[in-house]
Amino acid sequence: MERGLGTVAAVSDLGRRHHRNEDSFSVGNTALPDGTPAVVAVVCDGVSSSSRPHEASEAAALAAASFLLAALPRGMGGEQAMHEAVLVAAEAVNQLADAEREPGRNAPACTLVSAIAAGGQLTVGWIGDSRAYWVPLDRAGAARLTEDDSWAAQMVAAGLLTEAEAMADHRAHAITAWLGADAQDVEPHTATFQPDRPGVVVVCTDGLWNYAEGADQMARLVPDGSRSTPLPSAQRLVKHALDAGGHDNVTVALIPFPPPPSAQGRKGDA
């Protein structure tokens, strides 16, 4: 599954070890009230231990993107819009729960990561361990924009393990926050950045970042010319994950920053 709008692109692949793709994405263009282009990408990863994880990720991605594409033109600020979008996505996933149909099973659940590029700013929002990275055109100062909700991240934050030690543990990828009816109170993470140079935002599931965890590693993978060719570049990133083993579903969205003028006034999602 792939989608290219020129100003943003996303690709999702089954991987080599799974019989079903439980990832989903939604991307789109709109404009702020003053006509400034705004670009949105949402990527979700269904929790495999839950029931119907593919439905959860699809519902969350579509709900969050639809909210953002409607809220930004009305003048809602980026962080507020992102916060509300994650909550809207959470409610969409909650509505999938059906205890009578699936007794004893975990309710549908997924992670979510989203990015908005507009007005010289990048705003990201997330729940779970799907990630966003900033990769400048010159590759200098690449950065991870999100912090995982995971066992590994908790161990590192507590000073109990180094990142390398935590990631080597079999519990590393156990997530500590997600969207779903059996989740604790959902507290969306949001952050806003003001890059001082052009580049691209990489929004992805762990099916990609498992093979490029560090920001510098991710920066080396991003093809030259990604700002002008986001779809072929996203395809190459997915191919890298597949060539490296493809142990999971893999989904990546690329947003060129700043958004080109062609984003102005156009809308789209998938």
What are these regions (language model features)?
Residues 1-270:
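PP2C/PPM-type serine/threonine phosphatase catalytic domain
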